[in-house]
Amino acid sequence: MSAQAGAAQANEDESHKYWGKAEQQFKHKPASQFFDPCQEFADRSIKCMRRNAGDRDMCTDYFQAYRDCKKAWMTQRKEASR
């Protein structure tokens, strides 16, 4: 049992080491680089594909909504960076 506890501690230490390297970068990046506001549209289109056995023709509205969202988001990001 103590060998498992030691392995768990080693895994935890290793994950903290990797997070420590990324933490500073994560905290100093704009939120948009870690959050996709169009993720809900992407999830809905995937659910539609699963519901319709992969028939893309049944999900065109979902795909278009995702493309419109992504286009608006990219336009907004470009304007914000000016």
From Swiss-Prot:
Disulfide-bond pairs as recorded: C38-C69, C48-C59
Descriptive protein name: Cytochrome c oxidase-assembly factor COX23, mitochondrial
Cited InterPro entries: COX23, Cys_alpha_HP_mot_SF
Domain CHCH as annotated: residue spans: 35-77
Keyword Transit peptide: yes
Keywords: Disulfide bond, Mitochondrion, Transit peptide
Residues of the transit peptide: 1-13
Assigned protein family: Belongs to the COX23 family.
GO biological process: mitochondrial respiratory chain complex assembly
Span of the annotated motif Cx9C motif 2: 59-69
Entry's localization field: Mitochondrion intermembrane space
Function, as annotated: Required for the assembly of cytochrome c oxidase.
GO cellular component: mitochondrial intermembrane space
